[in-house]
């Protein structure tokens, strides 16, 4: 979906399923790609969106969102986004759900936001479960809970950096009002791979609750025998906070 394109309802639900192609020469075979487009469920409508990246190419995310005003949102219903990264062989950079510069997943009113992603099955690096990266990249709510769960690609045997959830380069995950923010991540990788964090908050990335809600983070490092397979890591001004709740 490019800039200016939209899918919307006035009071109904939106259900979208997308699957990338499987040609061995294909790259960026995202299951669902939103580049400046918008998906909006009005009234009490909900959004359920699922994407699976192509099984052969590299850089094939399950769900890929980028470029303002790209967004998936509701007026008050729940928003659920799930994705499975594609790839095979030496494929890399196949995230389950990638929310990149200028893109947002949100819910209005008391609607909850659920995002779940599983990194691709290639043996390369950067097969994140959920990636929130870049200025304006945001997963948020107006008053409901925000729940993000990511599983890094488990077949990464050559290099590491298959994080469960990465919040990077000023990307943000946050709930407002009474909503709690819960982030759960499982690092991927096998053999001697390293730097497969469960949850990594890096380069001014932020996980927060701006109201009275709590922040709950659970991270499990990858299974490789290399270094830095930590559960939860903050680096380079990464930020975790709650304005009125516990962390």
Segments from the language model and where they lie:
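Surface-exposed loop/turn motifs in large extracellular/passenger domains
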Residues: 1-247
């Amino acid at each position: 979906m490019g800039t200016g394109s939209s899918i919307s309802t006035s009071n109904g639900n939106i259900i979208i399923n997308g699957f990338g192609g499987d040609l061995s020469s294909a790259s960026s075979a995202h299951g669902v790609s939103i580049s400046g487009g918008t998906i909006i469920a009005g009234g009490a409508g909900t959004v359920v969106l699922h994407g699976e990246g192509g099984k052969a190419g590299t850089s094939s995310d399950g769900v890929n969102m980028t470029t303002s005003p790209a967004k998936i949102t509701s007026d008050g219903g729940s928003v659920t986004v799930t994705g499975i990264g594609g790839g095979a062989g030496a494929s890399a950079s196949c995230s389950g759900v990638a929310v990149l510069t200028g893109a947002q997943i949100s819910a209005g009113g008391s609607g909850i936001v659920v995002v779940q992603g599983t990194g691709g099955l290639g043996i390369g690096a950067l097969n994140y479960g959920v990636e929130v990266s870049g200025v304006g990249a945001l997963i948020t709510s107006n008053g409901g809970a925000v729940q993000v769960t990511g599983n890094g690609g488990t077949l990464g045997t050559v290099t590491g950096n298959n994080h469960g959830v990465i919040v990077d380069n000023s990307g943000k995950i946050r709930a407002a009002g009474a909503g709690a923010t819960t982030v759960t991540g499982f690092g991927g990788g096998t053999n001697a791979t390293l730097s497969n964090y469960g949850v990594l908050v890096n380069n001014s990335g932020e996980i927060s609750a701006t109201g009275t809600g709590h922040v709950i983070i659970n991270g499990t490092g990858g299974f490789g025998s290399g270094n830095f397979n930590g559960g939860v890591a903050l680096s380079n001004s990464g930020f975790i906070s709650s304005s009125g709740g516990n962390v």
